[in-house]
Regions:
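Long, intrinsically disordered low-complexity tandem-repeat segments
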Residues: 11-55
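Bacterial N-terminal signal peptides
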Residues: 60-69
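C-terminal motif of bacterial Sec signal peptides marking the signal peptidase cleavage site
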Residues: 71-73
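Active-site signature of cysteine proteases
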Residues: 77, 248-430
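N-terminal regions that are enriched for targeting/export leaders
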Residues: 96-129
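Second-shell loop/turn segments in exported
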Residues: 129-141, 184-192, 307-314, 323-324, ...
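Papain-like cysteine protease catalytic cores
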Residues: 164-264
Length: 430
């Protein structure tokens, strides 16, 4: 038994000696080899490996940087209006326009995006009416149609009534009217699709309306080109009836034939009946503010696009702003017609303002209009209000250039900008 224990102890001792030799009791040469394998390299070897690791890290960093640049370049939208991207006072920067803006989703998503972008720049949204998706007028002069319909849509949406109207239906009827006048005047009447906000109300009352889903196309129609083709086709016909049919064919080829009836909530309407159900003849009124006409009267404003000779009720500037605010407080959107050719109108950044050095008074406003510094360029729909931490008041306006800017198709108009550059307002009756 003792011999067996001695033998076991001897075996254990020899095993420890072997392990000791294997794990640390090596000769200096062997230890040097293992040390080299585990990091104790000579300076030259360390330098080579460090350089290799540095080159790998540099390559990885460059690849990551290149991928970020490519992704940012592909996702950046193209703005309709050229801007320098500078930051306006209390405004938004053009960097926000790199956000994904191709799909609106639900109304709540639009509101959340607007409020989030504004919040990042110290602007608080205080009022935002429900809106239908932002549309794109494309290569057409139909901002007045889009803005008027958007005001009607948002006002109905605020009252809990969902309605989305077709701009192409009004554009078709405008085309037919202009082509008739052009043919009957033997080309002396200008074939123009430009207009003002009250002209859209005229078309609704006289020709009716169509739901957007019943009469629209997936992409914007070039109504300028369509009108040119219509004139050429009509001029080739010897009689008025045949000329009208030729123009109607051009419109059919562009957007399709007009449905004879409107089906809504299980009921059948004519286009005129449907228009009366969404826009009464006395529901909207036009206002302006210029001193070359007396206040308190309906005036025929001298605008090149006022083709129907519509009148606007002339009021003092403070009254005009009061009407705008009261309409928004009553959950009614407002059609806006005015000047966007100013340097302070930054579409990509989503903000419009005038320099602080400009006195936004009735007199200065009139002076700029008289000198043609304020022109009738564009129409928008005012659907909300906001205020910056510096106290600057803004109006939130919906555009018709698609969701191509920082606010996904909306823009903040400062109160100073509205006071100086508004030509007319389309305000709902109380």
């Amino acid at each position: 038994m003792c011999k067996m224990m001695d033998m076991a102890g001897l075996i254990k001792t020899e095993a420890r000696d072997v392990n000791a030799t294997a794990y640390g009791c090596m000769k200096p040469a062997a230890r040097g080899v293992n040390a080299t394998a585990h990091g104790c390299m000579k300076p030259a070897a360390r330098d080579v490996n460090a350089a290799a690791r540095g080159m790998k890290l540099t390559a990885i960093f460059l690849l990551l940087l290149l991928s970020v640049v490519l992704v940012a370049g592909c996702s950046r939208p193209t703005a309709r209006k050229d801007t320098d991207g500078a930051t306006a006072t209390d405004g938004l920067t053009a960097a926000d326009s790199a956000a994904q803006v191709t799909d609106h989703g639900a109304r709540g998503d639009v509101a959340r995006h607007i409020m989030a972008v504004c919040r990042r720049h110290g602007v608080t949204v205080t009022l935002l009416l429900p809106v239908t998706p932002v549309k794109n007028q494309g290569r057409s002069d139909l901002c007045w149609v889009y803005a008027a319909l958007a005001a009607i849509e948002s006002t109905h949406a605020a009252a809990g009534d969902s309605v989305n109207l077709s701009p192409d239906y009004l554009a078709r009827n405008m085309l037919m009217r202009q082509a008739r006048l052009n043919w009957l005047s033997r080309g002396r009447h200008d074939m123009s699709m430009r207009g003002t906000l009250p002209m859209a109300l005229h078309l609704l009352r006289e020709d009716g309306a169509m739901p957007y889903d019943s009469y629209s196309t997936p992409s914007p129609i070039n109504w300028r080109a369509t009108s040119r083709r219509a004139v050429l086709a009509a001029n080739c016909e010897p009689t008025f009836d045949r000329a009208e049919r030729a123009v109607a064919t051009c419109a059919d080829n562009a957007v399709g034939s007009v449905p004879p009836h409107v089906f809504m909530l299980g009921a059948e309407y004519s286009p005129v009946d449907f228009a009366q159900s969404v826009c009464r003849s006395d529901e909207w009124h036009m206002f302006t503010s210029f001193t070359h006409h007396p206040f308190g009267r309906d005036i025929q404003l001298e605008l090149a696009d006022n083709q129907f000779g519509d009148t606007f009720h002339n009021v003092p500037l403070d009254t005009l702003i009061h009407l705008l605010d009261r309409s928004l407080d009553n959950a009614r959107a407002v059609g806006w017609e005015g000047d966007i050719s100013e340097e302070g109108f930054r579409w990509a950044a989503g903000v419009a303002d005038v320099p602080r050095t400009v006195a936004c008074t009735q007199q200065e406003r009139q002076r700029q209009f008289d000198r043609r510094l304020t022109t009738d360029d564009h129409c928008l729909t005012i659907v909300g209000r906001a205020v910056s931490r510096r106290g600057t008041r803004y109006y939130i306006a919906k555009n018709s250039w698609g969701a191509t800017n920082a606010l996904r198709g909306f823009i903040l108009l400062s109160e100073r900008y509205v006071r100086m550059k508004t030509v007319a307002l389309m305000v709902g009756a109380e």
